[in-house]
Amino acid sequence: MSKIEKMSIQGVRSFGINDKNKQVIQFFTPLTILVGPNGAGKTTIIECLKYMTTGDFPSGSKGNTFVYHPKLAHETDVRAQICLQLKDVNGEPVAVQRSIICRQKGKSTECKTVDCVITRIKHGGPVSLRPKCEEMNKEMISALGVSSAVLNNVIFCHQEDSNWPLSEGKRLKGKFDEIFSITRYSKALETLRDVRMKEDQNVSNYQEEIKYLKENKEKAREIQDNLQSKEKQLTVSKENVKSIESQLEPLKDRLADIQRNLFKVIRLENEIKALESRKRTMEQDNQDLMEKMEKVFQGTDEELNEMYQNQCFVREKERKLNDHQREMDRACKESQRLNREKGELLVQQGHLQLEADNHQRYIKTRDSLIKSLAVQLELDGFELTPFNQRQTSNFQMLVKERQEEVEAHANQILREFSEREAMQQRQIDEIRDKKTGLERTIELKSSTESKKHTDLKKVKYDLQQLEGTSDRLHELDEELQKTAHALENVEKSCNLEALKGEVVQLQTQKSELDRNVRELDQEMEQLNKHTMTRTQMDMLKNDKADKDEQIRKMKSRHNDELISLYEYFPNKKQLEDWLYSKREDINQTRDKLARLTKELVAAEQNSNHLSNELCQKEKQSASFEEKVFDVCGSQDFNSDLSQLLEDIEKTSKQRAMLAGATAVYTQFITTLTEENQPCCPVCQRTFPSEAEVQDVINDMQSKLCLVPDKLKAAEDELKRKEKRKDEMMELKPMRQMLSDLKEKEIPEIRNKLEAINREIKRLQNDVEEQESLIVTFVSEEARAEACLQDISLMEQYQMELRDVDQKIAHYATKLLGVDLNRTVQQVNQEKLEKHHSLDNVSRRIELLQNHLQNQQEQVQQLKSRVNELTAEKLHISSNLQQRQQLEEQNVELTTELHCLSIEIKESREQVFPLESTLQKLQQEKQALLQRKESSYREAQEKVNDIKEKVKKINLHTKDIEKYIQDGKEEFKEQKESELQELTVRLNECEELKEKINREMVTIRQDIDTQKIQERCLQDNLTLRKRIEELKQVEEERDQLLKEMGQMKVTQMEKEYQELENKRETLKTNHSLTLGRQKGFEDEILRFKNELNEPKYKDAEEEYREKMIVMRTTELAIKDLDIYFKTMDQAIMKFHSIKMEEINKIIRDLWCSTYRGQDIEYIEIQSEPDEGISAADNRRTYNYRVVMIKGDTELDMRGHCSAGQKVLASLIIRLALAEIFCSNCGVLALDEPTTNLDHENIDSLAHALVEIIKSRSRQRNFQLIVITHNEDFVELLGRSEYVEHFYRIKKNIDQCSEIIRCSVSSLASYLH
């Protein structure tokens, strides 16, 4: 059983927020009493307990008023913390802490829980967790062992909600439904009903699904058989393909070798032709070069190379020209670099000039500021500018001294005013201390006066009470005698031994019923254990019936078809034999068809090959004709070529003549010019006059001028014709090939193509005939195969039926010894009857035990009453002896009060003149502070003005000094000198560029003159090189002819044709086999895809699992019906039993507590809700509290007084706590004496003591009573169950304090 041990409170309502204000309360067992005046904070403790256990703030506050208000704390955020130490239902220690923060936002406050910590002891040490608030609440409910509704409405019920048992009907119903958890159980029943309806619907759905799953299962078996057949055919086809490929591979290798050799032959032929053409071209080029040369060198190669090397001075000239060009480039780069440096120097010079101008401006500004400040500070010697360094330093020193004087003056003013202010403050403090002392004296004496008044009232009250004590003493003697007599009569009338014997007999009967219930539980467990076996057996029987029906349907479906093929209904073996023979016929026909198809494909391939070859030959012929026409311009190639050769020869001679004319004319002109008496160089005749000589020379020179142009034109024409000749020579082999194509190759291909087309028509007719025959055979085979699948399935079903029979026999063996006539429902009904009998016996035992306990309690109550009366008699006797002492205290207190009143009046008269004097001094102090502030501000402004001007002067002085220290003036002069020097160097560089340019022009002229002679030597070198290359070409041609003669070209071509024919045959077979294989693979893929479809993939497994699910679901629906009825009956029974127990406790507590005669007892009546239909199946109740007067019962709400209402609510809470708090012995009563008269308060105290006494055997029982009625506390304190109580009061800071007090001190406090 759980219990609470200790709690600390800080920052909640009136409990302070500082650590010193933290209050700790330890809860006693079995009774904890909290007493204090209204507003002291008693109910706050109940609110804290409720918040710690449920997480709920007090109603209507949302936590905003639960925490110490931020305005009272003068803070924006206020934190509150509550710690609770308890033991859970297992007796384990648990510490819980919750922290709250309240934040002021404008006029409103916001409060929330910021931290939750729960600490447990695990593995010998504390373990702390920080769960969320909702998880924390669940942890607390689990630790305490009671629901949240019981914590809120029974255990920790707030004073404002304590009368909820007499609230209006809807609210009362809600409270009791929460306590009984009616809503939760009703929802459980609704959930059971919903689950059952859902499962009913599921069974219907399962039946529909099973129908389709069964069809899918059968279809999947059919597809699987077809797949296996096609896979076997595919395996055979793959083996055929491998065999053909193994024959093709060596053929391909050999053909590739031959083809490479043939390509090599063609390449050699092309290379030989190219070499021959190149040889002719080279010979012609050499001839042309010799004709073009003026003189062919007759010496050796060494002599020619030596002469050519002697011409190297041209190279030297060119090298020198390149050197001059590089010097020119360097001079240009140097000129560009000097120009860039000149530009950079000009930019630097501009910056330096700008800095010099700024330097002069800074000097003028600084001197102006110095002169102005000197006039302001009345300093002499600074009238004339500019100032030198010495004057500037002297000025700064003088200004510093004058500045220190001004600051010293300002500080002097500040010290004088501070001294006067301190003296004024001392006077104020003296008068304030005197005034405060008088006020404190008045406060203390007023407090003492108030306390004395209270003591005086108490003394007078005690004296008044003692006036009737003698009569009360007499009454106590009479009542004590009556109670002792009643106790003696009750002890004689009790028959306790007989009651105990009957209880023992009933307990024996209860043990026997317990044994019967356990036996039924074992039988129920045995039946449940074999439920699955019985289900499996039923499913197997259903499966057997289904398979029998499938076999019958298959026979009726294929009977006509099979009889038409075989004249009887065959078995699987007979049908497979027939199919085998039919497939042999199909294979033979297919082989024949394949052979014909192969021949047809080969013929078609030959036809296509010949067609393509014909097309290529025709295209090649047209291409050759087009090329010949493009080059020749006509189809007469030979005549065009002869004409072209004649033109080339004529042009070559003309070119040679023009080339020689230049040398001849030059020699003639030289001869005619140099000789004194020249003669004609041709006819050797002398010229009659110089004029004729000159005419001849002029004529030769004019012709000589025309020779270069004519020579160039002749060379161009010769090159053009040579190029055309080369193109025509290249076309000569093409011309021969064109003739062969037209006259031989194309007519032969056309004849072969016509013969092959006739063969193709014959083969097509044969293929069509074989294909129609295959269609007939395949149709018969397909019909037989369609039947074969079902026949195989029939035989499989027959085998499965044998397995099913064996399984049925196996399950029947397992169920031997099990009473199949007793069902789970029968055993469950018998178990319910035994439980009902057991409950009746248990209630009878409990009734007898309660009766026995009541008699024992009655005796104990009478004994307790005798003890109480005796104690009260002794107490009254003691009080009578204290009367003289109380009268003396009355006189003493009256005298002290009179003296205190006079002293307070005198102190108040002394306070008034001190207040006026204090006010006057404070006004004088304020005026002094204003003058002090004004004077100091004026002096400070003067100092700041001087500092600002000095700062500006220092800044300009710093810039001036920096310019001088950096040497900017010298740097400026240096850059100007560098600029002049750079200008001189730039002019020198330009002069050098002019000189180099003149030398380069001279060298170029010399080089052009020498290149003509060098060209002649170069032509001789080229001719000799070409002759050497021609020899190499002839040797290479001879080598290729020799290599080509070693290869057997004709034999290779024949072998290539034979191997090609064989390869085409194998390729045709390979294509046909691959085609069939592709068909098999497509069918296999189609079958596999069908099997991989969701409806076929696991069709049989899904069918079996769905059947199991449907059967088990049907059984579960039956169990749900049983459980629903059982649970509904259990809820009704639980509710009625608990209400009987609650009403019994209420009746006993009312009779023992209520002292009036108008109400015999009260009880809670629960009635089913008439507004709920029977179809809804929800058990709901309406509750009302009634009071019994004779034979009449009335609703207590509206018919009872305020005191009766409080007492009834309290008793109902006590009864609910007795019933629902078996795991938690805590109960808190907040102001239970509200609206009760004195007699009912006494009886309530007596009832609580009796409850404590009856529950004292429970080690963790705790009753917490909060009250302001100290008489009620005193009555509870008379019992032996309480030694200390807590007094709640507020301290001087108006913060709540919890003080532990002894019960023995309560009497002295009261009296």
UniProtKB/Swiss-Prot annotation:
One of its GO terms (biological process) is telomere maintenance via recombination. InterPro entries: P-loop_NTPase, Rad50/SbcC_AAA, Rad50_eukaryotes, Zn_hook_RAD50. It comes from Xenopus laevis (African clawed frog). Its EC number is 3.6.-.-. It is found in: Nucleus; Chromosome, Telomere; Chromosome. Zn(2+) binds at residues 680, 683. GO terms for molecular function: ATP binding; ATP hydrolysis activity; double-stranded telomeric DNA binding; G-quadruplex DNA binding; metal ion binding; protein serine/threonine kinase activator activity; single-stranded telomeric DNA binding. Pfam families: AAA_23 (PF13476), Rad50_zn_hook (PF04423), SbcC_Walker_B (PF13558). This is DNA repair protein RAD50.S. ATP binds at residues 13, 38-39, 41-44, 67, 159. Component of the MRN complex composed of two heterodimers RAD50 and MRE11 associated with a single NBN. PROSITE patterns: ZN_HOOK.
